[in-house]
Regions:
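N-terminal non-cleavable signal-anchor helices
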Residues: 3, 15, 164-167, 213
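Aromatic- and Gly/Pro-rich amphipathic surface segment
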Residues: 13-14, 22-26
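Functional-site microenvironments in short loops/helix caps that host divalent-cation chemistry
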Residues: 24, 28, 33-35, 39-196, ...
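N-terminal low-complexity segments that are often proline-rich with Ser/Thr-Pro
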Residues: 2-18
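Residues at helix-coil transition
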Residues: 3-4, 90, 150, 213
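Short, structured beta-strand segments at or near domain termini in extracellular proteins/domains
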Residues: 205-216
């Protein structure tokens, strides 16, 4: 685990949950080795290090919302708002799925088929660019790993029709938005308008993020 320190945003919070090799799923199956954390934290240098050089182009996983937020701030960027994420996912064409043509099959994204609630013990994330980009040139907006958004989650917030909305109200559950589905989730969760949420301090093998930065 890595703890935010100093004057960093959310100092004292756990940013990253480092997954171990050889774990088991809640159903008792052995977890795929590629679902371990492929980065480690060197306490001597105070820096992250790659455990496996072959994973350099894979999406980071096990990241909690705090860690994703802090990373974005460190690079003077931000997490996408939910509205920004959906706009990017649709590729300027109101796509149903955030693929190259708005349709979905297993040649276009890394996900777990069409049946809800089925865990894939052989599943794992894959390298970015393994599937075609969407019309904006963005890879893996659907599947691979869920992506944290900046907003707090509100069940009815996003249907009010506001332009470029950002939900800054924590609400009763204090959850943040995540979008895009993952290798471990079924096809419906990859829809460009499918919404999900989770607690800020939760990370696992299918939670990741991407950042946005204003063009200079």
């Amino acid at each position: 685990m890595v703890i935010g320190a100093g004057n960093a945003p959310h100092a004292g919070e756990v940013f990253l949950q480092l997954g171990e090799t050889g774990g088991c799923t809640s159903g008792g199956e052995e977890e795929h080795i590629n679902n371990r954390s492929w980065i480690s934290f060197n306490t001597s240098s105070n820096m992250f290090e790659l455990v496996d050089d072959t994973k350099a182009t894979w999406p980071v996983n096990w990241v909690k919302w705090y860690g994703a937020y802090a990373f974005a701030q460190y690079y003077t960027a931000s997490l996408p708002t939910e509205a920004q994420w959906e706009c990017a996912a649709q590729g300027g064409q109101q796509l149903e799925y955030p693929t190259n043509d708005g349709t979905l099959d297993l040649t276009k994204a890394n996900y777990n088929g069409d049946t809800p609630g089925v865990y894939n013990p052989n599943g794992h994330s894959v390298a970015v660019g393994s599937y075609p980009a969407n019309p904006y040139g963005l890879y893996d907006m659907g599947g691979n790993v869920w992506e944290w958004c900046q907003d707090y989650y509100g069940e009815s917030f996003y249907i009010d029709g506001a332009i470029d909305p950002v939900n800054t109200s924590a609400g009763p559950n204090n959850k943040r938005v995540r979008r895009g589905g993952s290798w471990n989730y079924h096809s419906a969760t990859l829809l460009t308008y499918w919404r999900a949420s989770d607690f800020e301090n939760r990370g696992n093998n299918h939670f990741g993020f991407r950042i946005v930065k204003q063009a200079e």
